[in-house]
Every structure is written in C-alpha cells, then in structure tokens.
Amino acid sequence: IRVTRQARLRRAGRAAGAATSPRLATVTETTDAAARAPLAGRTLIKGHGAQNDFLLLVDPEREVDVSAAEVAALCDRRAGIGADGFVRVVRTAALPGAQSFHEAVPEAEWFMDYYNADGSVAEMCGNASRLFAAVLNEEGLVSIADGESITIGTRGGARTLTRAGELWTVDMGPARLIRPEGAVADLDAEGWDTTVVVPGLEGERAALSVAMPNPHTVVALATEAELESALFAGLTDSDAPDYDPRPPSGTNLELVVPLADEPDDEGGAPVGRARMRVLERGVGETRSCGTGCCAVAVALHEWSGEDAPEDYLIDTPGGRVGVHVGADPWAPGATVLLTGPAQIVARLVLPP
C-alpha cells in the first residue's frame, strides 16, 4: 500500500465513518433448541487478508449447526483444512440474541459470526471483516461498488467497510486503554501498564494494554533482530508468555519495532512505520492481525507524544496494512481506520 493510496483510502474511510459511524450496540447471545442441518457436505470459502487466513460458511438463515470442536478440527493445519479463524456469514436477524442490536443498527443486515481457530468465540477481527465484505459482494448477497460502503454487525459492535478497488477500509470503532487491575502506577504514567516475559527475549518487557475491542498487549522492541529472536512457535497465550498482571480473559500479544517515518507523497504529514509479530489469543502466531495492527498504531501514537503521526504503515509477516488513528484516538467519537487487502482463494466442499 503506497502512501498516496493510503491517503485516498483514508478519505474514503472518513466519508464512510461520517455517513455511518459504528454503534456500540452489542449482541446478547442466547441458544436455541431448533434442529439445524449438519456442517457435513457444505461448501466453505477459504480466503485471507494479509495472509491472515479464514474459512467462511455462507449460512444466511443460520440453518447449519457448527460446534466449537468442528471449528477447531477444520482450522487444524495438519488434520483439517487450516485457518486462523472461522466465520459464519449470517443475517443479523437470524442470530439468536441479536434482536436489540438489529433494532439499534437496522442497516447492519449481515453479521460476522466469528470464531478463533480453537473454536472459541471472538469479538472482532479486522482482517476477517474485509474478507467478509468481499465474500458478501462475490456471492451476490450485496452489491458494493468501488467507493461504496456497507455496515456489518460484529460482537464488538457495528463496523463500516468501504471498498477501494482490491482494498477495503474498515472503520474499526474506538480504541480504549484497558488499564488492567493491578497495573503498576509508575509504569502506567509512562505509557505502560503491564510487564511481559516473552520466550527468546531477555528479562521483563514493559507493555501497554489496548482494547480494539478485543484485548491486546503491545511491547516495543529496539531492533528487528530482537523481534526475530522471540520464540512464538507452538505457543498460545494460555501457557506463555507470562504477564503481570495476568489478563483475565487472555490477550493478543504484539511485538513491534518502530521504524523511521515515511514522507507522504501528497505533501502531508509524515506517516509512521513499524514492523510487528503477533501471538493471537486462541490461535498462536499468525501472519497478520487487523485489530493487532490497530492496537500497535494506537500504542505508537500514545508513546510518540504531541508530534505523533496520524497514519501508520504496519508491516507484518503477511504483508502491509495501513492504520489511521487521527490526531487524538481518545477523543469522543474518534475511531480507528484499517486499510488492507482481501483475497478469496478457493471454495471447498466438505465430505458428507
């Protein structure tokens, strides 16, 4: 994503945000006793956003029964198809417990029913939301022309996506500092609230906790060599790294190396740059994480002070995404914009 394209998408995202700002209505999920069809024999769509890959089931009326065990089996890269997460494409009105959400945000006809690779439910995934919109468009469920927007439902609230060719800008909603209970006060005063021991890195590392709205713990490193030395292989947040205080609902860990700012080709303010790795809650290390990139940009902005860039280019192992945090991400009504690709790879039919 070149800076010029990022500036164009930033304007598109702002227009989408002005037209339909995300509502913080949430879904209070319930279970239903209605018998549903098995997942066997169904068609799944495989795709990715910056190599953060997902399996999607188009199930508009929620007719298919999907268990956590089935999700975990399908996402297993050895015994299944392999993916970082699973998404049911469902009408909001068909999701149990979503009635009040649908009434609050009637334009959010479609809901991103998202699950981590271990089958656990998650609030939101930025990369998956772009792929979700692309699938809606590709399957003919909606028509989203270049420059047009769509609002979808997620467990983190409504999200608006704007198409710009092969890229999508997602209004990710507001960022929030978590302020974990038991945080060390003097660390918090300096922009840190947690310490983390990461395998492969020496000693405790200071970190900042950010909600997007799912929880993130961001650690700044000095060099790219140090970033490479972190031992993430085979780890999940359930057994490592070690956090103090320990996040009660788990967390996504981002390791980030700030890089030199990049000039804006349109003559605007410099664009911040960084390289990152992520250990996702319920998944392990992934090639990219949309909410994680947003959390990293917000943390960098917080650490940089008054002259902090409003825009960031974040390089992940899976590619580059752009994040707009604005002049003050904590201001009332402020939201974070995420820009990146969405690519459909294949359609797969499960055995009966």
Descriptions of predicted regions:
Residues 2-23:
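Compositionally biased, low-complexity flexible segments
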Residues 24-165, 218-352:
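A glycine-rich beta-to-alpha transition motif near the start of alpha/beta enzyme domains, typified by
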Residues 85, 173, 207-209, 348:
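Glycine-centered structural positions embedded in regular secondary structure
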Residues 104, 184-189:
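Short intrinsically disordered coil segments
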Residues 164-167, 206:
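Short glycine/proline-enriched coil/turn segments at helix->beta-strand junctions
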Residues 167-175:
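Membrane helix-loop-helix hairpins that form the core translocation module of multi-pass transporters
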Residues 176-180:
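Short, charged/polar, Gly/Pro-enriched secondary-structure boundary elements
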Residues 192-228:
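Internal active-site segments that recognize and position negatively charged phosphoryl groups
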